[in-house]
């Protein structure tokens, strides 16, 4: 219940609209009770009353028909406004929740994303919030409507004939029990279907994304069997759900018809004894139909409340994740020179293994420094620490002799440009992807940045040039072209510190040489750190830092390190061995 109350806090800005919606629902409840009463009056006073002249009977029936038409029209209008208003309120609340949730996700540390798959986070923001919407659109006002309608129906039944109500009251527990049993098994089957749908979706998402590997290794038959397995489980759960529906729905309907038969049989006895009129019997049967609706509705709403509670738990679990609190919001906002220094830095992603051990290194402006080492040595982790994506467990990182914690981390990142190994492009235009949706940057500035990394000639040949559409993560654009666009981003934002993580690994030799020249130009007044696996790209670096098993084991120029014949020498020999 705490979760539901927490959800209701989001309804507070819409309190007046909720009050109006509840007033409409209560009016709807009252008007819904009128049609059986109108027909009852028509039957008792005009249709079966032979004491009235024929023209008076016709006039009375016509008058009742007008009342019936007005009441059904009122029901239509009230239902329209009720549905419209609750859907509007629910949509606004879910809009607010989604916005809050996504804003919170943007402020989460990278360590959170290392532990949680992106599909799970997407489900929380997109699907679970949609489940919550149903709570606001159909549960709150519907429960009020159902409770008052049940009370109203029972009151009207007692008003029509207390004796008949008492005599047939045994059918109510039977109907209620049948509906509850049906709902229990239906919910169980429904949840099994939902679970299997999620598994099918997850299988498709993972294996369609990996389709190049599937085709490359001729794994189509294996994939077909794998999908058939999860698809068959979904099919079986669907059949189980249909079986439950096929058994229980007719059972409930049959019990309802038997209840009507019992009312008609007992009502006939009352009519024969002159203690009940035909109109009273009709009204009683009509009110039984109205009695069934809120019963089924309430049991259905219970299912929705359970689903909402489960979704709310997932939403608030994500919302309660600790935000990134690295740095000082009121701290330093400007990198003046760009001197980066690691002092006795120890870092790990998980408790069981240190990635970096006692790192001591300094990067100066005007100097091109390359970091090399085997795969998994800890090179990329150094970049992540400079960006403030992670916090070291021991030691400190200083920029311009000021600890990273004393900077405003968001302002700091604006002044550090990084080209990662895995370049992400967003849906939109090439222009948007280079300037990263900073509309204040004009096309001419973007063009100059692209020229500096020698990619403008390629873009100029495209039919729509900078307005070429990029689809889903840059599909259709080669890995090399993506890296060039990422380089252009870094050049455009003119940062003090410039980090390239394997940034030329997918580029041809000629373009790579041009990029090296561009990087050399950048290093004249900036701190440039180049993380590289291919040693041919770093031979002209001012200084090379060699990382081995998380430790810095060597430093120097290419020539100096080759003369030492240490780790760097061995790596070089392996790469260039004939």
What label would you give each PLM region?
Residues 18-78, 158-163, 261, 272-278:
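Transmembrane helix-loop-helix hairpins at lipid-water interfaces of multipass membrane proteins
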Residues 110-111, 127-136, 140, 148, ...:
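An intracellular "coupling" helix at the cytosolic face of ABC transporter transmembrane type-1 domains
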Residues 219, 243, 260, 290-318:
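Cytosolic ends of transmembrane helices, especially the final helix of ABC transmembrane type-1 domains
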Residues 68-75, 79, 172-179, 245-259, ...:
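Hydrophobic alpha-helical segments in the permease module
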Residues 54, 327, 333-578:
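ABC-type nucleotide-binding domain
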Residues 1-32, 47-67, 82-86, 90, ...:
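Membrane-integrated ABC transporters
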Residues 13, 17-30, 71, 141-192, ...:
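Transmembrane helices of ABC transporter permease
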Residues 2-3, 11, 86-90, 104-151, ...:
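Juxtamembrane loop-to-helix connectors within ABC transporter transmembrane domains
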